Swiss-Prot record:
<dbReference type="InterPro" id="IPR017946">
    <property type="entry name" value="PLC-like_Pdiesterase_TIM-brl"/>
</dbReference>
<dbReference type="GO" id="GO:0006629">
    <property type="term" value="P:lipid metabolic process"/>
</dbReference>
<feature type="transmembrane region" description="Helical">
    <location>
        <begin position="148"/>
        <end position="168"/>
    </location>
</feature>
<feature type="topological domain" description="Extracellular">
    <location>
        <begin position="262"/>
        <end position="542"/>
    </location>
</feature>
<dbReference type="GO" id="GO:0016020">
    <property type="term" value="C:membrane"/>
</dbReference>
<keyword id="KW-0472">Membrane</keyword>
<feature type="compositionally biased region" description="Basic and acidic residues">
    <location>
        <begin position="623"/>
        <end position="632"/>
    </location>
</feature>
<feature type="transmembrane region" description="Helical">
    <location>
        <begin position="65"/>
        <end position="85"/>
    </location>
</feature>
<dbReference type="GO" id="GO:0005737">
    <property type="term" value="C:cytoplasm"/>
</dbReference>
<feature type="binding site">
    <location>
        <position position="308"/>
    </location>
    <ligand>
        <name>a divalent metal cation</name>
    </ligand>
</feature>
<dbReference type="Pfam" id="PF03009">
    <property type="entry name" value="GDPD"/>
</dbReference>
<feature type="topological domain" description="Cytoplasmic">
    <location>
        <begin position="136"/>
        <end position="147"/>
    </location>
</feature>
<feature type="glycosylation site" description="N-linked (GlcNAc...) asparagine">
    <location>
        <position position="473"/>
    </location>
</feature>
<dbReference type="InterPro" id="IPR030395">
    <property type="entry name" value="GP_PDE_dom"/>
</dbReference>
<comment type="similarity">
    <text>Belongs to the glycerophosphoryl diester phosphodiesterase family.</text>
</comment>
<keyword id="KW-0963">Cytoplasm</keyword>
<keyword id="KW-0378">Hydrolase</keyword>
Amino acid sequence: MEETQDSSSSKPKNTDENFSLWIEQYFNHKCCITFLTGCYSCQWQYREWEKTELGSCCCSRKEQFFYMCLVIAFILSVLFLFVWVETSNEYNGFDWVVYLGTGCWFFWSILVLSAAGIMVAYTTLLLLLGFLLLWERIELNLHTSHKVFICLVIVLCSFLLAVLSHFWKDKWLIAGLSLQIFAPFVHLSLITVMIIISWPLSICVARLESEVKVRRYRMADYEQEIQERCNVFQRLRALQIAAGLSFLIILLCLYLMPLGIYSPCILKKENLGPKPTLFGHRGAPMLAPENTMMSFEKAVELDVSGLETDIYLSFDSVPFLMHDYDLTRTTNIKEVLPSAAGNHTSNFNWTFLSTLNAGKWFLKHKPFFGMKPLSEADKRRAGNQSIPQLSELLALAKREQKIVIFDLFGPRPGHPLRNTFVRRVVKVILDSKIEQRLIFWLPGFDRDYVRFMAPGFQHVGRLWSIKDLTKHNITIINVDYKRLFYAGLRDYKEAKIYIHVYVINEPWLFSLAWCSSINSVTTDNIELLNQLSRPLFFMTPGFYMFMWLFLDIASAVIIGFVFCYNWIKEIKRERWLEAAASSGLLHSETITDITENNDASQQKPEVAPTSANLAPENMIELQKTEPKTENL
């Protein structure tokens, strides 16, 4: 019985021992080095790597060149990812443009975003692996496949950035706007990053200083190499100054960064204007097929202030709601009349247009990424939608007292209403008996006639000068948000111009509009923007000042402590060196023992010790063994 108990009690011990052995076997320094070299150089066989000396080149010229290429690839990929993430408000428009060129609806914007994220992750991982290998003082040897992929990343990112600069210059404007609102938080985050970086940097700077002093001891025994070693000292000092001074300059720039920051969302609470009212862009296109009565009714249910749409006139003079110049994307014309699918929207009679289905496409191809799933009732309702007339929208707006704003597209040459389409639309509006104040009249053609026939319409201008707006007696502007913030927003506010911007879907952009005292916005994302009770990233000047000074002082104290701690640690190593030198411990046999105890690279006995080899724990072992040698 006792033997049985002993054997049963020994099982957990054996299990623990086996687990410890397993941990030691697979999670040790050798395995770590093998993993790093395997990922970076595809060399998965462990061997004793020859370590480079501090102050010497870490790799060949060729490897230095490709490491610089890696840094360039990282910068380009991060830049492209930043621009693309910040332009998420424009993803639907990008997908629509690609659809016009390819005829295939797909979330191309998300595909590009995924590719950018993969490139950033890939280059970041390679940079991290290279840094860890340099930290271990192992010579870099990037695998050929990585070199090819790095070149592809540089070419692809350069091409995509060039395309953005040529075809979508306004995307850079969005990136600039994002910096306005995110700059205070980027500043605070970067200071935190600098605190993290200070730890390895302080170790590096202190180790370089210690390395210089260690090599000075070596010069006493190798006087013939003094000239050569002086060059090494210069390189070590240069590395030390370059690393420390660069860090200090960047840190000081970050400390002073708030002096150059302008963010509309840093203002006093009493200066924050009311929340901008929302206009449904073609209704509520995230909840129902765009420009259908279901879409506008959904927008009304969400309590929007206005409804935005697009108007064409059929060949038999009926104004109807449609955005595209053809019917292929939002109707089933390819099934009903494939031969005429590419014809212009205004070339059809209303008798034919009224028979088309305008909702099935919405169920097949979601227009927005991340849309909520529809209920079964909404699916059935959406699948039965048709193209609505303008009169139907006006009846809804009249009943619910909602503002109506629209883009009016003129007919093509040969259309019966080629020159009188504005008058036809005005007649339809007046016949609906809707209050004229609820019409935001945007079209600029035949405006004098409109003023005469409907003096109650609220005329809306574009991004005109204050002088032109005053000349035409216009107090409302409808502008692209990307252009407005760079075109003298303050001047329009001082002139008491009502500002309406389009199309804003992202909360951070809506917060920017709110902090800038914009009156109303057109949006696809009504539900999300309705939930905002205050602007995102809003801060009072006093709170930001407190955070700025507090983080600056705290970071300076922490960074100073980190540098002092690692510096003192290296000073202790130097004292052990002096004690060892004065007691005669530093001869060739002792140096060899130190090297072996620290798993250093295999060196000849004549090679001098480095700061890493002269750790206090090694010197303790030496003190135990060395006196015997001296007595002999």
